[in-house]
């Protein structure tokens, strides 16, 4: 999901923002020039910023691709400098598999996943120090976090002076030729990307083309990763429900072209040996998931009622009415099939039709929920949600951290340029060549494992819609999967973390008491699910070898809806300067703007905020805790805050 587009800069004193926020000079990086193309290079630096386990290495860096019209089959007259953060596995990295991690957006940084969900460390509330995450996904797997497409996070096209408004949550290109303006609580300065919407991928398919070229360079020429295990997996989240299927199927198609000698260019013939696609709370296809946006706020396992049955029914009628959401989605897809068959998004007529479908579906589906003032990413939380806390933004603003990373740009966890580019062509309304559910089917037929994992408190990409996707696939195992029942996910001797339907290589899991970013809410459960899938074990128990038992299927109930949940207490409010629009009250925003707010470690201490009201419920829905002995992480976990202006088209 989308976060505030804040640029992280230094704020070292309480109640002021006087320090200049530009990154320090880049020093001490290793430069590796490609043996295939003199204009391609990798720059990187080893550090222990987050992973502090003795003997476990980690590296930050960029893969630099020059402007080149031939790279992607589309006009690419801009440099691509793609950021990565690589963590070796804590156990046996030489023989461990590797997983790529991608957040969604479109335009969200994968640092969200690293620091808020499954990376080696949590950021403490001082925004300066870290705590080891014992449930890190790099315990047994090499992890590669990538900021993509171009201009996302630490990735950039050209270094550009910028200002950031904490009040309006916007980045603007700045001219500092007459001097750098003084910083204050509401206006910060830094170095970022050009902010040009055309200087990045403009749709999911073009992003797939771009990331494949990154992978060709990184896996062949990054000198610090020479494993015995060449398996590669992709795990992703949210808008990654589109990224993951599209990217993985594109990788698989390119593998086939390399094998049959359709691709013969030197430096582009590395087989990416795909093993697993994992999607967490994925927004995959509106045709399957649209109705869940009407149903979930009214009918969920927490007894929360964001609106009435009459409102729910009206939304569904709007979706199905002539010239409604479904009609416009169909028109977009037909227009794209005829007018943009190669998915370049360079046909203005098709772009306009699909952008209208994208916008209208947002309107039908999202506006009724906005009135409830509930969290998009956690329906049990208020809209101004301090959980997960966004302390990683301040952490990544430290000059010492930027220096250790070797980054020439400040951190921005959301790219306005990418968001504008994708939404301008109506990317969320479009499919790719097979459609994203078709991609999943293709991967399953190709022997790739696919796991759909959904937290049951998320609204924006909720589990009801995810379940519909899982049941709507058309592949050789469709009927066997549908006949499989739901089994308990046994996390430890005292805790059941969710329910899973699995047949062979395909699974759908509902994770209890988790919002959008499942690993941040339920780190132990998420790690068990992740490792069981990665190492070919059944998700329910982790005891059966699925590689040796391809006909394995879970047994149990047909539905999970009978398992109800208790509403958790509302989190204590925390107004965080670098997520002000998503965590602060109007009074606090006014204090930030006029400079009267008292700030300590980016947290607004005065004026203070009062705790929000609990969500509305209905007495007709029984509630019961799904199990005892919850393995939820209590602290310190770094998570996200959302924007009150979020719409369906923005995802993490």
Swiss-Prot record:
| Positions with a binding annotation for substrate | 461, 517
Q: Which InterPro entries match?
A: AB_hydrolase_fold (IPR029058), Peptidase_S10 (IPR001563), Ser_caboxypep_ser_AS (IPR018202)
* Keywords from the named record: Carboxypeptidase, Cell membrane, Disulfide bond, Glycoprotein, GPI-anchor, Hydrolase, Lipoprotein, Membrane, Protease, Signal, Virulence
Bias regions of kind Low complexity — which residues?
A: 618-628
Q: Per the UniProt annotation, where are the glycans attached? A: 77, 132, 161, 168, 184, 202, 260, 299, 347, 410, 474, 492, 505, 594
What family does this belong to?
A: Belongs to the peptidase S10 family.
Which residue intervals make up region (Disordered)?
608-628
Q: Where is it mainly found?
A: membrane
Q: What is this protein called?
A: Carboxypeptidase S1 homolog A
Coiled-coil residues are none
Q: Residue positions of GPI-anchor amidated glycine lipidation?
A: 629
> Pro-segment residues?
630-652
- GO:BP terms for this protein? proteolysis
A single GO cellular-component term from the record reads: plasma membrane
Signal peptide range: 1-19
